[in-house]
Regions:
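N-terminal and secondary-structure boundary signal
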Residues: 1-168
Length: 168
């Protein structure tokens, strides 16, 4: 398997170089400015957290990515799919309310929130999974499939049910 470069930064801030500026620098170092985003719909895939939860990437990081995409001519939007479990992201209306409550609004991030698999989580496209032995297909939210590009803005975390999450 081929490996990809992995870029890291620390959380220390210095005068004139805050976290958002560091993220922008990382994105440029990774070659984001070499991607053709001109007039393309760009999904920024992330999760907006549950109500009362703080274990998600802050909206200002999403804004940094969205601003760079717009600078490069793209049309960014934030997206995620509804959850299978009962919570504040089980259907699109509560999911969007949760996103806004947790700070992910068009006013704070500079782009819209679109729930990728629609109102009830049934707006999906079945796609083949190459080389899969047990799950030959996967259902993907239609908005993700309709996007011209997808940027995955994720974090890694321990999860009660699976041992890890947030990086899927």
């Amino acid at each position: 398997m081929n490996t990809s470069p992995v870029y890291f930064t620390d959380f220390r801030c210095h005068p004139g170089l805050n976290q958002q500026q560091k993220l922008r620098k990382l994105l440029l170092k990774a070659g984001m400015d070499k991607i053709d985003f001109q007039d393309k719909f760009v999904a920024i895939k992330m999760h907006f957290g549950e109500l009362g939860n703080l274990a998600y990437l802050r909206p200002n990081y999403a804004k940094t990515v969205a601003d760079l995409v717009k600078e490069l001519g793209g049309r960014p939007f934030l997206t995620d799919c509804n959850t299978l479990y009962v919570g504040s992201r089980k259907h699109a209306l509560e999911h969007i309310d949760t996103a806004y409550t947790n700070g992910f609004s068009p006013f704070s991030t500079g782009c819209h929130v679109i729930i990728a698999d629609g109102l009830k989580g049934t707006d999906e496209v079945e796609v083949p999974v190459e080389g899969a032995q047990y799950c030959p297909t996967a259902k993907i939210g239609r908005a993700l499939m309709d996007a011209d590009s997808v940027i995955s803005l994720t974090h890694f975390k321990g999860h009660e049910s699976t041992g890890f999450g947030g990086a899927l």
